[in-house]
Amino acid sequence: MTALTGDQIRQKFLDFYAAKGHTILPSASLIPDDPTVLLTIAGMLPFKPIFLGQEAPKVPRATTAQKCLRTNDIENVGRTARHHTFFEMLGNFSFGDYFKGEAIAWAWELMTTVYGLPPERLLVSVFENDDEAYDIWHRQVGLPKERIQRMGEESNFWTAGPTGPCGPCSEIYYDFYPEKGLANVDLDDDGRFIELYNLVFMELNQDDQGHRTPLKAKNIDTGMGLERMAQVLQGVPNNYETDLIFPIIEAAAQRAGIQYQKANASTQTSLKVIGDHTRAVVHLIADGVTASNVGRGYVLRRLIRRIVRHSRLLGINGLVTPDLAQVAIDLAANVYPNVRERQAVILSELQREEEQFLKTLDRGEKLLAEMLSPLKKAKGKKRSQPQLAGRDAFVLFDTYGFPLELTQEIAAEQGIGVDVAEFEACMAEQRQRSQAAHETIDVTVQEGIDSLGDQLHPTQFRGYEELSLTTTVTAILVAGHPATTATAGTEVQVILEATPFYAESGGQIGDRGYLASSDALVHIHDVQKQKELFVHYGKVERGSLKVGDRVSAQIDLSCRRRVQAHHTATHLLQAALKKLIDENISQAGSLVAFDRLRFDFNCPRPLTREELQQIEDQINAWISESHTTHTYIMALSEAKAKGAIAMFGEKYGEQVRVLDIPGVSMELCGGTHVHNTAEIGLFKIISESGVAAGIRRIEAIAGAAVRDYLQQRDSIVRELCDRFKAKPEEILDRISQLQADLKAQQKALEHLKAELALAKTQALLEQAKPVGNSHVLIASLAGVDPQGLKTAAEWLLNKLGSGAVVLATQPAADKVNLLVAASQDVVQRGVHAGQLVAALAQVCGGRGGGRPNFAQAGGSQPAKLAEALELAHSRLKEILES
């Protein structure tokens, strides 16, 4: 058995199967195409549509090294030898081509010949009823019967779900202790055995009754964990000490000033967590995920926060994730070049997220420590495990942004549980409070609709083809309650048999318009969808509307056209962002209204003015190119196969509506759109801003709304011209002159402040005291900003020649600024300004640091300032008089 690097193991696997006629395919993204799946959790996931018969295979045989990420066992990461979040799954796949005989024979050849594993260390399992696989292993491969175990359905039978393709599995295990013999072997003993290779034989189809029948086209799906194979071939005790992860662990240990091999168990666990999670966050960001509070973004945020938390447990202060990520990038770049291409994005996202979390962590840890203190004292007095109240955990989360998972982790370290049920109840109460005000009418309407029971049939929506139609009123609600009649002046909700009105969904607001009968006119100002019913919100303007009336339903054509322009422009905006900024950008929310559009998307940084202009220019170019739009109804699997963009978290039926702008954009969309991009006319970006961590927002206008916007801007320019008595082209110069005058006055004011600070500083010089062979000056200054503090320290140190200066100021009631400066000879005698100011800041409830000769810090407890300055005096005296 020859030791191989992780890269060599991966390449040998791919080369072996390529020689067996397999096409080597690149790893799919960690963001799967399937909008119902959060992350790519298995090597077979990219091929799932093929295995389910939804897509035809492009090749009969394939082999991959697939990036995967799972968080279901995140608490076990670092605590066991083999649990990971991020891992690589090596696999070979057959789509109706070869089957069990070849799959088993090749797997054995790979393990024993290519990787050189001793046959006497290998055992296999088969499904208890799979005689065919058993015979292949025994008779064709020649494996002794005592090395083949039949196992039950729970461990050795794979299903895609309640129905669909399924089949038995066969697994290859490595024995770390063959000297123990084969009597009473338990393959689940992970201290002795490690599962290396899993072969799935998809040969059956399961119906909704649980009956299984043979498949015509039988498939092979296999998986080998790269990290596990590396552990075996590199002869290390766990996956973390392989060359795939250990360099990250070593980098973290070096930052902490410790040696991994000499560290205790809890320290090693923290280092393993850091190593594992760092790989995960690098690949998540490289594949387009940004930190947020939902979905994949929350997975990323949680992993980053766990890295920071475990780094703090090791005593690592300051930013840590960018440095560790650089190690992970260097390890992966040769195989996954996108981590190098997106290196700047990865490091920037990690720095931003870590800096944000450190603010949360400091405050949250202090509050949590106060909450846990009485529980720790009571722990020995109670037989049951003490629990932190869920309401307290909720306060930490809701008020201070401290994650529940982190509260649980810190509490568990001290043997304390958390009442998660109460926490969830508090969350539910908060959601109800926040939604109650604007949901009252909707809830009442929903109750009114429910009370009508089966009297109502789903509304026929015909608004794609018809803008007006004659239909029947099937229900009327007044104040949310069913009614038979509504008279003039009454606010109503009307349900029709059929409607041309679009109901609000997918970010697009509902149509406006009117209903007219021989006796009534109803103005419709909103349309909402309740279950399968379209509820038209309006007001009876004249006459009397009755259930059973025949009415003419007419949408407001002007409003519909404005909405259509904004909706198609939204699709163009997403296409432009993907083309010009990052192909991994995806929608996080949207609003399509009559007067504007709003588009939220994942992006770790603000867009520049130049980028926004490029986006605007690209969209207007597409508009002027007069692209015809096409809508299609097709199967969801077909739409995904064609590359249509779906929004994660949306639930889609088997049949979906697709808007295609050939060569520009293809998205799943149920909204209304222009027939040709030229109908949009013009597109204008109004603003770009951040709405949450990792989420940016663009607000824009299109079509007639641009005309309104330009008229308004023209009015503003005319008003400025009148005020400045200037022509439009002269206004900027006038404003620049005003700014220059203001800047000159501010500069003069700063000069006066500096002179005042210098006068105060000169008076301080007399307070310097001799300590050892140097002078020490410790003082507090009033009315001086940090820059003034720095200027004063430099002047004083220059006058002292040899010595140390410690200055403090209190710029606000709850704020302290501290500064330590030292001459070079004093530094050589052992004074370190950065370490000293950190100690002083800690006394004042803050933090900071810096160079040996100069450092600044801040604190939040001015009452402790005198104590901090006394500490400075004693520390300097101790060093300089020794």
From Swiss-Prot:
Catalysed reactions listed for this entry: tRNA(Ala) + L-alanine + ATP = L-alanyl-tRNA(Ala) + AMP + diphosphate
Cofactor(s), by name: Zn(2+)
Metal-binding in keyword set: yes
Domain of life assignment: Bacteria
SMART domains (UniProt xref): tRNA_SAD
Keyword Transport: no
Gene Ontology MF annotations: alanine-tRNA ligase activity; aminoacyl-tRNA deacylase activity; ATP binding; tRNA binding; zinc ion binding
InterPro entries from the UniProt entry: aa-tRNA-synth_II/BPL/LPL, Ala-tRNA-lgiase_IIc, Ala-tRNA-ligase_IIc_anticod-bd, Ala-tRNA-synth_IIc_core, Ala-tRNA-synth_IIc_N, Ala-tRNA_ligase, Ala_tRNA_ligase_euk/bac, DHHA1_dom
GO cellular component annotations of the record: cytosol
Pfam families: DHHA1 (PF02272), tRNA-synt_2c (PF01411), tRNA_SAD (PF07973)
NCBIfam families for the chain: alaS
Function: Catalyzes the attachment of alanine to tRNA(Ala) in a two-step reaction: alanine is first activated by ATP to form Ala-AMP and then transferred to the acceptor end of tRNA(Ala). Also edits incorrectly charged Ser-tRNA(Ala) and Gly-tRNA(Ala) via its editing domain.
Name the record gives this protein: Alanine--tRNA ligase
Organism: Thermosynechococcus vestitus (strain NIES-2133 / IAM M-273 / BP-1)
Lineage of the species this protein comes from: Bacteria, Bacillati, Cyanobacteriota, Cyanophyceae, Acaryochloridales
